[in-house]
């Protein structure tokens, strides 16, 4: 799908070689593809550097939370529903390209572009802090529940890209930076589908999805120069990940405290989504051409 979008953007660029927006979009599509290759190499390195994964701790946290991805997988990973789940999970990159095009051509701002660049840099660092692969890779019988006692850590050979769910964080960023009712509605639908697909496919634990919410809010707050909000959401992310890395038994042994903490984390995300303003939107600086113009920052 991304290859078709790249071809379409290339042809569109040739129709008006003086429109700088077309070159930017073409470059961004290439950047997305290049990042995919680089990220795969980095994850392979992290897999070798961190052979012991924390999937057992994340599974135990999900159990203590009272929500795991296994029942959802058993419900949806069959027949046409399984195919739909797979397609939704794979649709993230094409949707990102669409958002890049909308940002350049329709919304005249670069907020989502810079947000995803920040996320791209931060993702491998977070993966290294809590290396985990996802239930589909840690438990060979997924979506059937594990029959044996699961150790807190285990030796696995798979990409440690579970914690946090960058798929969900990215889908939430698409919603935060969407403009217009239609695209906000589409982004909300895509976010819901992404959450369901990441869990049902066994790519992520429930805790991965929960922590993805403050990750997205941290990126958005940083980009929009909301220092206090960025500190709050960044601290929430670090607190979760450091606790999971160093003392998950503290949360596992106190399920009520775990559930309350998870609920407060999601509420913080909802607060940011409901009350943020768009004053931090960053317009593209024009380079000339018939469409080049400064676009005033949007308020409200």
Question: What are the residue ranges of the model-derived segments?
Answer:
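Interfacial segments of alpha-helical transmembrane regions
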Residues: 24-29, 97-129, 187, 191
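Membrane-water interface signatures at transmembrane helix termini and the short loops
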Residues: 189-225
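Transmembrane helical bundles and short interhelical boundary loops of multi-pass, membrane-embedded
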Residues: 235-297
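Membrane-interfacial catalytic/cofactor-binding modules of polytopic membrane enzymes
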Residues: 125-181
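Membrane-interface loop-to-helix entry segments
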Residues: 81-96, 157-179, 206, 210
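Transmembrane alpha-helix/helix-exit interface in multi-pass inner-membrane proteins
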Residues: 40-56, 119-143
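Membrane-interfacial alpha-helical segments at the cytosolic side of multi-pass membrane proteins
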Residues: 99-103, 168-184, 214-223
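N-terminal transmembrane-helix/juxtamembrane module of multi-pass inner/ER membrane proteins
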Residues: 1-4, 22-96, 286-300
């Amino acid at each position: 799908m991304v290859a078709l979008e790249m071809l379409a953007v290339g042809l569109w660029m040739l129709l008006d070689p003086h429109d700088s927006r077309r070159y930017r979009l073409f470059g961004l599509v290439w950047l997305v593809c290049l990042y995919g290759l680089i990220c795969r190499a980095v994850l392979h390195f992290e897999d070798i550097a961190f052979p012991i994964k924390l999937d057992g701790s994340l599974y135990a946290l999900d159990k203590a939370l009272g929500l795991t991805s296994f029942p959802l997988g058993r419900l949806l990973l069959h027949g046409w529903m399984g195919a739909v789940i797979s397609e939704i999970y794979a649709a993230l990159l094409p949707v990102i390209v669409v958002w890049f095009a909308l940002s350049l051509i329709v919304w005249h701002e670069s907020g989502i572009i810079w947000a995803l660049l920040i996320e791209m840099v931060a993702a491998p660092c977070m993966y290294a802090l809590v290396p985990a692969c996802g239930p589909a890779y840690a438990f060979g019988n997924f979506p059937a529940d594990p029959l044996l006692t699961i150790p807190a850590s285990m030796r696995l050979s798979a990409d440690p890209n579970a914690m946090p769910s960058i798929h969900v964080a990215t889908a939430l960023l698409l919603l935060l930076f969407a403009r217009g009712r239609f695209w906000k509605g589409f982004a909300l639908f895509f976010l819901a589908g992404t959450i369901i697909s990441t869990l049902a496919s066994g790519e992520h634990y429930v805790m991965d999805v929960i922590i993805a919410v403050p990750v997205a809010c941290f990126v958005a707050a940083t980009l929009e120069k909301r220092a206090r909000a960025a500190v709050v959401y960044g601290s929430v992310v670090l607190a979760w990940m450091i606790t999971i890395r160093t003392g998950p038994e503290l949360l596992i042994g106190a399920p009520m405290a775990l559930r309350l903490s998870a609920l407060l984390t999601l509420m913080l995300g909802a607060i940011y989504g409901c009350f943020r303003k768009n004053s931090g939107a960053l317009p593209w600086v024009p380079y000339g051409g018939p469409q080049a113009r400064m676009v005033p920052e949007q308020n409200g």
